[in-house]
């Protein structure tokens, strides 16, 4: 959030703060620094309405597993942050040999599906930001009210 005030002063468009915002306190801080809104994506991954798989939810809630995230292109061909697993570790987070979007997701589909039937998330895309501390098994409405400080 250190750059947020400078960005707000430098542009003439509304700024949406994102990255690590997982509590009402952080939402309030971003708004007080000039953000027009906040984006709190990871906080919603364990909400009742989310289609996040059980393997993904387990990884998000496991502090040992979730401690390691990386920006990777191996699942989609485009960079996105996810929990580090076997595929990211062995191929590397950003791999020149990863197929371009949207072909990369097709390349791992069979491997991912087989591993998941065996209870393994080694080849699954488990998208997540660096701060999963706000994730909880609640409704999206409850999460929104919590983040709003209501």
Where do the language-model regions lie?
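Conserved active-site-proximal phosphate/metal-binding subdomains
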Residues: 2-16, 22-150
């Amino acid at each position: 959030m250190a750059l947020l005030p400078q960005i707000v002063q430098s542009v003439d468009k509304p700024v949406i703060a994102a990255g690590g915002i997982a509590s009402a306190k952080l939402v309030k801080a971003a708004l007080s620094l000039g953000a027009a809104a906040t984006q709190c994506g990871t906080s919603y991954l364990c909400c009742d309405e989310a289609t996040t798989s059980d393997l993904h939810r387990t990884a998000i809630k496991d502090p040992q597993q979730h401690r390691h995230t990386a920006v990777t292109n191996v699942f989609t061909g485009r960079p996105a942050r996810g929990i580090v697993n076997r595929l990211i570790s062995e191929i590397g987070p950003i791999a020149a040999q990863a197929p371009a979007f949207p072909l990369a997701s097709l390349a791992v589909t069979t491997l991912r599906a087989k591993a998941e039937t065996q209870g393994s998330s080694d080849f699954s895309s488990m998208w997540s930001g660096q701060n999963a501390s706000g994730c909880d098994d609640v409704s999206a409405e409850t999460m929104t009210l919590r983040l709003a400080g209501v």
